[in-house]
Each structure stands twice: as C-alpha cells, then as structure tokens.
C-alpha cells in the first residue's frame, strides 16, 4: 500500500460510477471539485456519484476565492485586444459592469487605483501580459505595457508584492460553502488565502451551520507566504498551488518555497498537498515526461501527505493512466528506506505537552525498533491518526474510526488507512478485531506478528492514553475472553 495520497480533480461531464471506480482502483484517495468550473448542480452530481461508488471517498471542493480579473472585452474588439510593448492604457476599478477597451482596462476591484502604487507590476493571464504603473491620479492608473499580447475577457491579474483590498469570501464562495455543508463535503480548499483572517471568514460560515468541514488553505501569492505561520495554525491543512504562486515568484525560488512550506506543515502536524501540473503532459500523452516524474518524486521525497492531479483527470485524455502513474511513482520512491526515516528523533514535528503527540511518537519509535507489522489505533475525530501521520513512520497506520467523517478526512493523511466501525466500543480492545479482520483481507497475519496499539482507556471521547505492543495471537485470545464474558 502506498503511503502518499492522491487527490484527483473530477469534472461533472465525465463523472460516471464506472469512471470513479476506475480512478479509485488506480489509487485515487480524494476527489476534488473546482467550483470555478462547475455549477452547483454539476457538483451535486459528482458528490452523489462518488458516494454511490464508495461512501468513504472524501470530497474536497475549491472555492474560487478573491481574485482580480479584467472585465469583459467590449464587443467592437471581438474576442481580444492586441497590445504591444510600450502601449499606454489607463486602468480603472469597476464593479464588473464596465467594458474593457483599447484605451481603458477595467478590473473588477473598485479600490484598485488606491491600492496599487506607482512602480508596481501587473501580470495578466498568468503573466502572458505585463504592465507597469508609471503614474496615477484619483480615478485611474497610467500604465505601460512591458510584455504585449492578446488580452481576453475575464483574465486573471496578479500584482506581486502589493496587498489589495479584496473580500475574504466572495458571494459565489459563500453559496458554494453553504452548498458544501448540505451535500456531505469533507474539505473546503479556500483559494488565495492571504492571512488567518481569510480562514476565519470561511470558518464563521461553517460554524453558523454547525459544520465540521475541514479547511485547506491554498497558498498562491506572496501575501500568503508572508503570513504562512498564522495560516498553518488556523488551517486543517495546506495546498501549495504552484501555478499562481509561480506567477508572483521567480520560478527558481518555487522549489525551496515548496520545501519550506512542507516542513512547516509536518512540524505543525497539518496535512500538506502539492498541486499544479504534476503530470501535465498526460493531458494529451499516455506517458509523462522524465521531468514530471522527477517532480512527483521530489514531492514524495519531501514527505508530503498528498500529490494532486488537476487537468490530467478533469479533462485529460488519459485520466486513469495518470492516477496509475502517480501511484507507481509513490510506491517506488517509498521503497527507499535509506531516505524514508521516521521523524521520531528529529525536532521537525512539534510535540510540546500534547499527550496524543507523545504517544504517537512512542508508537512510531516502537515500530522502528521492533519488527512491528502495523500501528493500530481507534479515533473519533481523526486527530490521533493525523498525529501518527506527522511522524512519517515506515509502517502503515490502521485507523479504526467511529464516524464516517473521521474516516474520510484521514484518507488525506500520509500512511493512514482508515476503516469504519459502525458502533462504539463495548470494550477498549474490541476495535483491534476490526483492524485484524480488515488486514486479513489483504495479507494473512501470523499469530506472532506484532502490532503497536494506540488507544484510550476511557472510551472514544477520552482520547488516547496508552501505547501497547502485542502479537496477533494474544489480541485474538483476549477478544475471545471478552466475548465469552459478555455472553455469560
């Protein structure tokens, strides 16, 4: 079983039960839905189809997020306006109702003129066009094209190093978040997160509806990087989306930026996902480039929780092969035990005074020093499983969950295989039998096989309180004795 998880983006036009099953069998762990490219009806179709195939498959939905865009091009210009380097234009703010012309480029942020200083760079359409602000007055920016090209309607705008007054949650985002609450979604991946304030705005909506959906913060701009520590602290997990990030930052700094974010997430015991163009050539080709294989491998060597496919599975010609390729790369890289050393003796993972974190580290240390086959735990919220994942042990973690939501969210965590127990404990050891039965389906367990057990003496609500090492024979014998006592 691979330890690195795979997030696959799903589009409604190709989401059939057979297609979902093929991706799941190929190695997909989490389904992603991008609200920027799907309607609420389309998203509902995806969720219902996925959960008909397997209710345990988690769903992640991306918000569109606060972003700057050029308004619609005026009809007289057709689909685009061509600009050359040196051309001058005025840039003005708008509520979106004004049309862009050759003389005036409108952007969908009313405060754009006051927010952007003279000297700033504005990158349009992921950097295909670039303009520089050479002057301004109260109503408009005087701009000159540095890089020309065809400007089309609704293209994105990035302003590196400048903080723009954008709302934390757009009206469309709010509608989709409320939709997610009603439709059994597990993760909200919030786009263009700039600070903890943006996360709190999403959390306030979730709290108002009594939802336990987890927030994944997408790091896509310099402001998000500047506030990365507070964002990690406020989030359930982090997604490093290298597309927009690569527009704002020089390409050569992206690898170190990615590595630094991954290390911070592992330290904070937060799941981390690497995204954008990981196997992009497989949109049209049945095989990846060598550079793409190395990119995926590098992320896995960095010990990320998950790697993500976007266009490859949403619209590409080889979606199943893309997932299979990513899964093969993960399994091959994870065989390198000289590199994949557990993080039990490093200062990388924060333990502090948390009992669960101390127990998780002890269990991973035991599984490293003893011939233990699996680490087994039970969990109500998923926290114990997430903490065990942070120490990146070599042994698979079997997490027996008492709630479907806990099973789903743990599907995103490194090295964790979550299974569902339909009833809470009648005895503190009974969850081990469920784990053994599940493992027996994949591999015959010998009586002498050792297990590291992380459990609680005070029921699922009491949290983890002990680590125990036991062999399969003694676990089964103890369960037989407990069953016999209950039948008396």
Where are these regions (language model features)?
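Non-catalytic helical/linker scaffolds that mediate oligomerization, partner binding
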Residues: 1-488
């Amino acid at each position: 079983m691979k330890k690195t998880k795979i997030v696959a983006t799903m589009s409604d036009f190709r989401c059939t039960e057979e297609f979902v099953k093929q991706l799941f069998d190929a190695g997909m762990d989490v389904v992603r839905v991008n609200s920027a490219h799907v309607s609420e009806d389309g998203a509902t179709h995806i969720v219902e189809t996925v959960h008909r195939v397997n209710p345990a498959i988690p769903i992640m939905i991306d918000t569109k997020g606060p972003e700057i865009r050029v308004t619609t091009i005026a009809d007289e210009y057709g689909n685009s306006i061509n600009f050359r380097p040196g051309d001058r234009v005025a840039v003005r703010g708008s509520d979106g109702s004004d049309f862009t012309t050759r003389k005036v480029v409108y952007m969908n942020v009313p405060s754009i003129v006051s927010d952007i200083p003279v000297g700033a760079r504005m990158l349009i359409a992921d950097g295909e066009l670039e303009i520089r602000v050479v002057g301004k007055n109260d109503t408009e920016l005087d701009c000159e094209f540095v890089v020309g090209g065809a400007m089309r309607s609704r293209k994105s705008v990035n302003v590196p190093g400048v903080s723009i007054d954008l709302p934390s949650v757009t009206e469309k985002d709010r509608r989709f978040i409320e939709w997610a609450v009603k439709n059994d979604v597990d993760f909200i991946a919030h786009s263009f997160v700039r600070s903890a304030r943006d996360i709190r705005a999403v959390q306030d909506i979730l709290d108002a509806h009594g939802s336990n959906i987890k927030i994944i913060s997408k790091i896509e701009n310099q402001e998000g990087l500047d506030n990365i520590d507070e964002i990690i602290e406020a989030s359930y997990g982090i997604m490093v989306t290298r597309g927009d990030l690569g527009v704002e930052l020089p390409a050569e700094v992206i690898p170190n930026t990615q590595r630094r974010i991954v290390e911070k997430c592992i330290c904070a015991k937060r799941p981390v996902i690497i995204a954008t163009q990981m196997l992009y050539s497989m949109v049209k080709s049945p095989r990846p480039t060598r550079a793409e294989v190395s990119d995926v491998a590098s992320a896995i060597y960095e010990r990320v929780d998950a790697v993500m496919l976007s266009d490859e599975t949403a619209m590409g010609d080889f979606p199943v092969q893309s997932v299979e390729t990513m899964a093969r790369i993960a399994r091959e890289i994870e065989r390198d035990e000289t590199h994949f050393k557990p993080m039990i003796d490093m200062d990388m993972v924060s333990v502090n005074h948390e009992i669960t974190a101390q127990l998780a580290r002890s269990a991973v240390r035991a599984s490293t020093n003893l011939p233990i086959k699996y680490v087994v735990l039970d969990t109500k919220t998923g926290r114990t499983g997430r903490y065990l994942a942070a120490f990146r042990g070599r042994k698979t973690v079997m997490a027996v969950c008492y709630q479907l939501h806990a099973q789903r969210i743990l599907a995103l965590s490194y090295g964790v295989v979550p299974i569902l127990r339909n009833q809470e404990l009648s005895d503190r050891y009974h969850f081990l039998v469920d784990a053994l039965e599940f493992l027996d389906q994949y591999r015959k367990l010998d009586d002498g096989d050792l297990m590291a057990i992380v459990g609680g003496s005070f029921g699922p609500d009491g949290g983890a309180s002990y680590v125990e090492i036991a062999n399969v024979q003694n676990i089964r014998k103890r369960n037989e004795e407990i069953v016999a006592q209950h039948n008396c």
